[in-house]
Design a protein with these regions (language model features):
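Short beta-strand-loop-alpha-helix junction that forms the active-site gateway
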Residues: 440-479, 484
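Conserved helicase NTPase catalytic core signature
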Residues: 1-104
Length: 491
């Protein structure tokens, strides 16, 4: 029986490995070849069918000056230009400026649709036969951001508008919407948990291997009052943290997100005046400047769509000259304030650093009336508790602080319990059903001398495996995702 089982197991693993190879890179390569072949075939047919358009394009390309604008060339050589470049990327404004007023594309796709107003979207929608709208209605809406200085405290005001995403939610039945189920950006679940819970996303997040150093909460102890949403001691701490990151982690991209525009400006002024000329900082900035993730200092209104390895989130708000907390948190106080926090709290891929003169204990619940300030306190509490938790409690300590979060883990079967006891008798720590959002790993194992530093993940061929809807999910994608997050996989 033993040899028979081993032979069957070996044959099954060989079959799985063959499937993974054919369903993975081989399948992608085959699809790419088919697309290239179809593209080249279509292009040759179009060039043969429209020789006058080819002549027009060549004539314009050879001109040294007085070239026709794109709209005019497109009107004269539409079929050929779309054949050469079947996929165009542009903003709705550019679409209205250069595209003919007719349906020239088969599909129009909007990305980050929550930030596109309906009037701006209509001009692009009219250029296509079908429409796909992708976006997150719980992130920033289109915003007209302006500032007032009515008194010594800085108050940012925003006027939010409805987006094309809001309109589509009304026009299209729920069954016409496709909801994403997984979050892939953050390599540690704690970097997305606050958004996942507070905004009711119910996304499955993948447990990361390094469960210790993804979160920092740096409290700035100061008696200096905050003015107009910025504290000078916090500004200094932010600049020091930027410098430290650029020196010790040059391989990681970085963005600084300030809660208010005035606070952002103060950080920029100090950093570029006192720090920029340091050699390691110049080297870091040059290294990242021409990439898709350059170093930037931004505010809540301008960071949507960005992602970086490390995010420094600087609060700025604090106490006045009398030592009292000022509950004026700019756009966070207003409608959609929680959506602004959601954007800021979900930009990090590897590390989130919170810098603040306030802790969650400083904020009185009775003073927090709207959703934005309430989530602000939850954010401070989550990251502070998680950062201060013992190593063997990281990943769960912060989660337990969040309201209305009931984490139900699947029960263990007798075989799993027996294996857990066996591993523990060998002197290791075993954490069953490891994870924070439903994408559980059956067991993770650590040494008693180094709790929280996971060495190994153990997965069983059990109920979850057999309940997977497709072989791709079961045998390829789950392993691929876990390996991407640092886990070594053994079958």
């Amino acid at each position: 029986f033993s040899n028979k089982y081993k032979n069957e197991s070996k044959s099954r693993l060989e079959l799985i490995n063959k499937f993974m190879e054919q369903d993975g890179s081989y399948r992608v390569e085959q699809n790419l070849e088919q697309i290239k072949k179809k593209y080249n075939q279509n292009l040759e047919e179009i060039k043969s069918a429209y020789p006058e358009q080819l002549a027009t394009l060549k004539r314009e390309a050879n001109k040294q000056r007085r070239q026709a604008n794109i709209r005019k060339v497109l009107e004269e050589a539409e079929e050929l230009m779309l054949g050469v470049k079947p996929c165009w990327v542009m903003s709705p404004l550019v679409a209205s400026q250069i595209l003919p007023r007719k349906e020239i594309f088969d599909i129009v796709i909007f990305d980050e649709a929550s930030q596109v107003t309906t009037p701006a979207a209509i001009t692009a929608i009219a250029r296509g036969k079908k429409l796909v709208v992708a976006g997150d209605s719980k992130q920033l809406p289109p915003t007209n951001f302006f500032k007032t200085q009515l008194d010594e405290e800085f108050e940012s005001e925003t006027q939010d508008f409805s987006s094309i995403l809001d309109i589509m939610d009304i026009l299209i039945p729920a069954k016409g919407n496709k909801q994403l189920q997984y979050h892939y950006r953050s390599k540690d679940e704690r970097l997305i948990t606050i958004s996942n819970v507070c905004m009711n996303y119910d996304l499955k997040t993948i447990p990361g291997l390094d469960n210790l150093n993804a979160v920092k909460f740096l409290k700035v102890n100061t008696k200096t009052p905050s003015e107009r949403g910025s504290n000078p001691d916090e500004v200094l701490k932010v600049c020091e943290e930027i410098s430290s990151h650029m020196e010790t982690n040059p391989e990681r991209s970085l963005v600084v997100v300030a809660f208010g525009s005035h606070h952002m400006q103060k950080i920029e002024d100090l950093f570029y005046r006192e720090y920029e000329q340091k050699s390691h900082i110049l080297k870091y900035i040059q290294r990242w400047e021409n990439t898709v993730e350059p170093f930037r200092i931004k505010n809540l209104e301008t960071v949507q769509g960005d992602e970086r390895d490390t995010v420094i989130l600087s609060i700025g708000y604090g106490r006045n000259a009398e030592g009292k907390v000022v509950y004026r948190f700019g756009p966070i106080n207003q409608e959609n304030g929680n959506r602004r926090l959601n954007v800021a709290a979900s930009r990090a891929k590897e590390e989130m650093i919170i810098i603040s003169t306030l802790s969650h204990e400083d904020l009185e619940d009775s003073r927090l009336r709207s959703e934005g300030p309430k989530m602000f306190k939850e954010l401070l509490k989550y990251f502070q508790v998680e950062y201060e938790a013992p190593d063997d409690q990281k990943g769960l300590a912060g989660l337990q602080t969040l309201k209305n979060k009931n984490l139900t883990k699947p029960p263990m079967n007798p075989i799993e319990k027996q294996i857990q006891r066996s591993i523990e008798r060998m002197g290791y720590i075993v954490e069953p059903q490891f994870g924070a959002s439903g994408y559980f790993i059956d067991f993770v194992v650590a040494e008693k001398s180094n709790p929280g530093k996971w060495l190994l993940a153990v997965e069983f061929d059990g109920a979850r495996y057999h309940s997977s809807k497709t072989a791709r999910d079961r045998d390829r994608l789950r392993q691929l995702n876990l390996e991407r997050f640092g886990w070594k996989f053994f079958r």
